[in-house]
């Protein structure tokens, strides 16, 4: 989304059940199709687990038992431990290069882990993709395409072969598309493999969240504005993408929450930020229901030991909800 920094914010969301929207301490579950009953327990509730953050984003669960997420305006990455404790995992000093000092959003955004468990970061303020090494230093994986600076990398996902896919809208630039520091004439979806950066998609105006299907045959990418779309692309054997098709169009849907982060579960259901909260889609693109929150949602991530808890970051808070199906996570 438009904010990418580090902050300690976790939203515990427990799932709500029953045919009618059921309200919990953090929100409610809107059930639109009986298929949702196989995903969300009947009496699950959305739980708010932490609050007081400044636009938390990019959550990722670390296997040793904690959640990391960016607090974009504060330029920090926060660490939340079940039980409620929040600490700073990576402070502003990691994001205070000259570029970030004049950025519209100075810190990190999307976060993920590679096969070695190293944190990989969309450092949107510094317009680059970095990796946090075991000794604490940051390695720049990429900051340019054909010699031109990225706009402001937003979200990212690893494929099982180790290649990294990411989106690059202009939200981190002070004037976004009209910013004089913008070097690329488009907002792209890119792939990093073997140290090489490849442009995959350039016809989306503001690509944002992205996630693979369980078999990695498809890559889902949403477009935040002005057209609010969830797109699906066939992944070719060489890792590039075929032509995109519209998976779901939000054109006629009211609400200020544009598509942002997304995740997929092991059965192929998609959980995508959208108007009112987290929209849940079947693999065929049927809208099964919505996790409705009073705050604007930015992203989500699978957590806990069994991978069945969906953590949600929103305007100032962290939520979670316990589901029946485990998610795909790094």
Feature names for model-found ranges:
Residues 18-330:
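Sequence-structural signature of mature extracellular/luminal beta-sheet repeat domains
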């Amino acid at each position: 989304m438009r904010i990418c920094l580090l902050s300690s914010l976790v939203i515990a969301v427990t799932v709500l059940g029953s045919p009618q929207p059921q309200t919990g301490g953090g929100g409610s579950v809107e059930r639109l199709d009986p298929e949702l009953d196989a995903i969300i327990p009947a009496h699950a509730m959305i739980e708010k687990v932490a609050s007081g953050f400044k636009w938390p984003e990019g959550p990722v669960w670390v296997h040793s038992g904690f959640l990391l997420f960016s607090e974009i305006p504060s330029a920090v990455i926060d660490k939340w431990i079940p039980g409620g404790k929040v600490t700073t995992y990576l402070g502003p000093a990691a994001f205070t290069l000259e570029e970030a000092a004049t950025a519209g959003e100075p810190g990190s955004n999307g976060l993920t882990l590679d096969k070695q468990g190293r944190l990989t970061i969309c450092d949107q303020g510094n317009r680059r993709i970095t990796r946090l090494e075991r000794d604490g230093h940051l390695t720049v994986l990429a900051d340019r395409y054909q010699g031109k600076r990225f706009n402001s990398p937003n979200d990212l996902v690893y494929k099982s072969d180790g290649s990294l896919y990411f989106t690059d809208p202009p939200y981190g630039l002070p004037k976004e598309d009209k910013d004089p520091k913008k070097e690329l004439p488009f907002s792209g979806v890119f792939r990093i493999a073997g140290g090489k950066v490849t442009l995959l998609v350039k016809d989306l105006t503001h690509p944002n969240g992205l996630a693979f299907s369980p078999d990695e045959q498809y890559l889902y990418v949403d477009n935040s504005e002005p057209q609010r779309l969830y797109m699906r692309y066939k992944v070719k054997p060489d890792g590039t993408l075929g032509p995109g098709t519209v998976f779901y169009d939000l054109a006629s849907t009211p609400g200020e929450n544009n598509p942002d982060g997304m995740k997929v579960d092991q059965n192929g259901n998609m959980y995508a930020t959208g108007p009112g909260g987290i929209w849940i889609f079947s693999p065929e693109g049927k809208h099964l229901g919505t996790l409705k929150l009073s705050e604007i949602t930015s992203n989500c991530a699978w957590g806990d030991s069994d991978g069945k808890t969906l953590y949600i970051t929103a305007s100032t808070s962290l939520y979670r909800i316990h589901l029946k199906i485990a998610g795909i996570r790094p």
